[in-house]
A protein has these predicted regions:
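Internal amphipathic alpha-helical repeat/solenoid segments
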Residues: 2-19, 27-86
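Start-of-repeat signature of ankyrin repeats
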Residues: 17, 52, 87, 121-122, ...
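Ankyrin-repeat alpha-helix packing hotspot
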Residues: 23, 58, 93-94, 127, ...
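Ankyrin-repeat intra-repeat helix-capping/turn positions
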Residues: 28, 63, 98-99, 132, ...
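Conserved ankyrin/ankyrin-like repeat signature
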Residues: 32, 66-67, 102-103, 135-136, ...
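Ankyrin repeat domain, specifically the short helix-to-loop turn at the C-terminus of the second helix
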Residues: 37-43, 70-79, 105-114, 139-148
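Ankyrin-repeat boundary/linker signal
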Residues: 47-49, 83, 117-118, 150-153
Length: 173
């Protein structure tokens, strides 16, 4: 049974093998995380939390750029597209929580398709805008293919404009 702590991405009994790995990722201890990966290589793409997050999700949410960069080096393009229980990729997590351009650049450098993956009816640029991460939103907007934003392809273009207006992202900066 999922408890309150599960909703916050904490470990439950089904993923207890990953407890030390999770803690290392949370606190930014790459040496401990790397040691765990050396012993358990499958953990690079495993869902290690009750919310089905991978190591990359956890590191992105915690804001540890150096760990994100190291994990991305070891992951396949497909691994970067893994979604958590809420449908978020690690890029969407970065757009939601931290707004770090280096994380986004690292992930998109390995898999350009991440810019197109929809989470809760939003592409990453909209997730960043909606959470006030304007620098990241501008970066993601520049990488977002124009066809995704065209009216004939859905509401994404209108959503980007609406979020930009709402968040005053169209200013002089």
């Amino acid at each position: 049974m999922a408890g309150e702590s599960d909703k916050k991405g904490n470990i439950d009994d089904g993923v207890e093998i990953y407890m030390d790995f999770y803690k290392a990722l949370q606190i930014g201890n790459w040496n401990a995380a790397k040691e765990f990966l050396n012993r358990h290589p499958h953990a690079i793409s495993a869902k290690i939390t009750a919310n089905d997050q991978t190591a990359l999700h956890v590191a992105a949410e915690a804001g540890h750029v150096h760990i994100v960069e190291e994990l991305v080096k070891q992951m396949s393009e497909e691994n970067l597209e893994i979604k958590d229980i809420d449908g978020y990729t690690a890029l969407a997590q970065a757009a939601y929580y931290g707004g770090n351009c280096r994380m986004a650049e690292c992930m998109l450098g390995k898999n350009e398709n991440l810019i197109r993956i929809v989470t809760e009816n939003r592409i990453p640029v909209v997730v960043a805008l909606g959470n006030g991460h304007l620098k990241l939103a501008r970066y993601l907007y520049l990488l977002t293919p124009l066809e995704i934003l065209m009216p004939e392809n859905g509401h994404m273009g209108a959503t980007v404009v609406s979020e930009a207006i709402y968040n005053n992202a169209l200013g002089k900066n």
